[in-house]
Structure formats: structure tokens, C-alpha cells
């Protein structure tokens, strides 16, 4: 149980440490740095979706033979559509954009920026929760080391995300303390989502392949809809692509080495 608690809190710690950058850094992150950090986060999320979620989902459905892809296929698409729905139902504003997404709202600009990151963090919390639920259920395809690898990978990419949200909030006029707090709060949905998922472990076990791929679909939606456009903004540069490759490689190595 202790390793499960640690696994849930590690990604949240990554967000909190990243948000703490606003307490020590005087200047806003440059576009170049933000592009690199966003590309890195995207790479980690894609690798985690493949090695930690989609592959285990298909392995657990191996008894279906040539149709083992069906649970992963179905869960993946439900995850995509779920995030698409949230994207249209929740008013939010990405840090490097002036165009509000979702329904019209009178919410403050800073509030909608926090909502954008919170929306992004929902699938990550679900991914951690589903993996640890599978571990607690004794599923052979999910090991403690593999679950830890996912938690560490998400924590690594949460660090730059924490900075990317807290620094713009500071630039919008919030105090350092408030910008830090909002950065931390944007990541609170991760442990909450993970705990809620684990609490339903008994109901989840039969549907684990679907839920693993659901989390993967939700994460990849965020990557394609949000992160890839953000890392490609401004003057053309290969920096975002290279940072993506670094993040992908690190997460792949973590999962294979620890899994």
C-alpha cells in the first residue's frame, strides 16, 4: 500500500516542484525554453501511452487471439472522445494563446489558464490510477517497477508543466505565492483521479484493458491537440522535435528498464 501512495504522490510532487520555480526565478520563461519543455512533456506522454498503457492493454487481452486489439481500440477511442467533450464543455485558455476555448465565460484569464492545465492533467491522473489499480489486483502484466516507471515519467514531465503554468500566471500580475498555489492546484486532479480510480479496483479489473487504453487515448489527445501546436509556435525550429525525442527516449528507457 505504501508504494501505491508514493506512486500517486510522485507526479503531484513533480508539478509542485515545477510550480515552485516562480518563487526563485525573476523572469518569464523564454519562448525557446517553453517550446523545449513542451516538446519534452509531449515525448514523455506519447512513450507512456504506448509502453505503459496500450501495450499492457493488448497483453491483457491476449486470450482474444487476433482480436486482442479490440479492447485497446475501443478504450482508446472512448478516451479521445471523452477529452474532446471536456475540451468543448470547460472554458479554458492555454498559456501561450489569447483565444479562449470551450463555452463563453466571464471567468478571469488566469482562472481559465489554470483550467487548461487541469484539463491536461486529468488523463495523467487516470493513467496512474488505472496502472496502480491493476497492480493491486495482482494483474501479471503490471509490475510494481513498471507502475513506478509511469509515475516517475509523468513526474518528470510535470516539472516543466508546473513551471509553464506558474510563470505565465506571475507575468499576468499574480503574486509569486498565488502563482505558485495555482500551479500546485492545477495538478491536484492527478492524485484525486488516481485515488478515485483505485477505490473502484474491483469494478475496474475486468475492464482494465479498456481503461488502460482509455487513459492512453486521453493523453494522446492532449499531446496532439495542445502540446504539439504549442511546441511548434513562433519561428520555425527543430528544438521542439528534438526535445520530444529526448522525452520519448527517457520514458521508453524508464519503462523498459524498470518494467
Residue ranges and their predicted role:
Residues 1-259:
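Intrinsically disordered, metal-sensing/regulatory segments
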Amino acid at each position: 500500500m505504501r508504494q501505491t501512495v508514493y506512486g500517486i504522490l510522485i507526479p503531484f510532487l513533480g508539478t509542485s516542484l515545477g510550480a515552485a520555480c516562480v518563487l526563485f526565478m525573476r523572469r518569464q520563461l523564454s519562448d525557446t525554453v517553453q517550446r523545449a519543455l513542451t516538446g519534452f512533456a509531449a515525448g514523455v506522454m506519447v512513450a507512456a501511452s504506448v509502453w505503459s498503457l496500450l501495450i499492457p492493454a493488448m497483453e491483457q487481452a491476449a486470450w482474444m487471439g487476433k482480436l486482442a486489439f479490440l479492447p485497446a481500440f475501443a478504450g482508446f477511442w472512448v478516451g479521445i472522445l471523452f477529452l474532446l467533450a471536456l475540451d468543448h464543455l470547460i472554458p479554458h485558455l492555454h498559456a501561450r494563446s489569447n483565444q479562449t476555448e470551450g463555452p463563453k465565460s466571464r471567468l478571469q484569464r488566469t482562472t481559465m489558464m489554470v483550467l487548461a492545465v487541469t484539463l491536461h492533467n486529468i488523463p495523467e491522473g487516470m493513467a496512474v490510477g488505472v496502472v496502480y489499480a491493476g497492480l493491486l489486483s495482482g494483474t501479471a502484466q503490471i509490475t510494481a517497477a513498471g507502475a513506478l516507471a509511469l509515475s516517475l515519467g509523468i513526474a518528470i514531465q510535470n516539472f516543466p508543466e508546473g513551471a509553464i503554468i506558474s510563470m505565465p500566471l506571475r507575468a499576468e500580475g499574480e503574486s509569486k505565492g498565488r502563482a505558485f498555489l495555482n500551479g500546485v492546484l492545477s495538478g491536484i486532479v492527478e492524485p484525486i483521479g488516481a485515488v478515485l480510480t483505485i477505490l473502484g479496483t474491483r469494478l475496474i479489473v475486468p475492464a482494465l484493458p479498456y481503461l488502460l487504453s482509455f487513459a492512453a487515448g486521453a493523453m494522446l489527445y492532449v499531446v496532439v491537440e495542445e502540446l504539439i501546436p504549442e511546441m511548434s509556435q513562433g519561428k520555425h525550429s527543430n528544438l521542439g522535435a528534438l526535445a520530444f525525442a529526448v522525452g520519448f527516449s527517457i520514458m521508453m528507457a524508464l519503462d523498459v528498464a524498470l518494467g
